């Protein structure tokens, strides 16, 4: 039987191993989840489920430091950023605990056919396939709305964060959720495909790579199952000539280095107006070069390791290929010698459309910088991408910012702020960044049977 290993990317030391789930265990988990869906837990009144979410939020808060430390050791996130991730998880749980009942109230529709309304009901067992970069937050985005609604979930987490997956499942059970409400499975891609094909599974949610999303969408489509996908992003950070440059640089550094750049909504393509480009690049380069690399548990560290040796090696290959095809290195550009999976903060300029890097997502501390002459060119460059997840625009003229935000082809745009997230706001993208929305009132309705009822008269 294969195992899932927890390895500290700061020093490459093995922390612990978990055995994978065999076919019998997966079959049993599906049986339990399906039975629970057909019970009063899912079909009955909502308050008992909301009480579990309230308890879960309290548990997360009470064990915040423990949870943050586990994540930082397992995937290399700075301890302060892990604490922030844990905090947003309790916020999401509380948001749905406090708002789900109102959101799911029947909605009236005026009609000549009679009294009409739409009710919201759970649809059944879901499969969730989630990544390692936010090992709790990604799970909570699926758990909280679907637990409130009454769907049951079988979760396949990324294989490099088994400890986070295991402790999350235990927290859900400790909060009072019955067996089958949320089940963690250490399984293969083939086993995921088999689950999606099972008639008892009614939907699948995936956050991950474009390749993984395409495979899941194909399998879901083959069996006519609802799916939502949150995939890669190549988000823009547009700095116009009237922007608060110091603040744009400060947040630009955060937006590129947070989680060692391993964020779908991280700023990756910096589009600068030519009037401020040289000043921005100078300040930005100095700030990136001043990053303190080290142990993510050390409060003084400002840039931790990449999540794994594979992640580091992919980034090395990407940057080397970009430079070989004409990109210019302003700073950085190499892996850091010694133990751990560290990579230098890097700026690339001079990337042309014939360079493969032009359309690639760099999942690490690498910033692509482009210079444009006007707003129209900024929008054209921003939209010349296969992806459409998020982005930000920096300007003192809010009307100008609104115009650009409306024209940029993404699911989310922030004006005078780096991309962010909050439980009450929808999260999702367009193009190859996926489809569907998570969080907010939209997220809880993705896997709901939106049932029309009409009383003729």
Report residues per predicted region:
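Short, well-ordered beta-strand elements within core beta-sheets of diverse protein domains
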Residues: 15-21, 37-42, 128, 237-240, ...
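N-terminal Rossmann-like NAD(P)+-binding subdomain of aldehyde/semialdehyde dehydrogenases
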Residues: 1-114
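Residue-level signal for inorganic ion chemistry
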Residues: 12, 49, 71, 93, ...
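ALDH superfamily catalytic-core signature
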Residues: 176, 211-352, 415
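Structural signal for hydrophobic packing residues in well-ordered secondary-structure cores
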Residues: 34-37, 41, 57-64, 68, ...
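Short loop/turn microsegments at loop-to-beta-strand junctions
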Residues: 1-4, 267, 389
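Rossmann-like NAD(P) dinucleotide-binding subdomain of oxidoreductase/dehydrogenase enzymes
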Residues: 105-247, 372
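Conserved C-terminal structural/oligomerization subdomain of aldehyde/semialdehyde dehydrogenase
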Residues: 11-17, 201, 292, 335, ...
